[in-house]
Amino acid sequence: SEGGQDFWL
């Protein structure tokens, strides 16, 4: 979300 890398979590 904030980092833009919460799509693989």
Curated annotation (Swiss-Prot):
Protein keywords: Hormone, Secreted
Gene Ontology annotations for the cellular component aspect, listed alphabetically: extracellular region
Main location: secreted
Function: May control digestion processes in crustaceans.
Similarity comment: family membership: Belongs to the gastrin/cholecystokinin family.
Name of the protein in its database record: Gastrin/cholecystokinin-like peptide D1
GO molecular function, one term: hormone activity
Superkingdom of origin: Eukaryota
Subcellular localization, as worded in the UniProt entry: Secreted
Organism in which the protein naturally occurs: Nephrops norvegicus
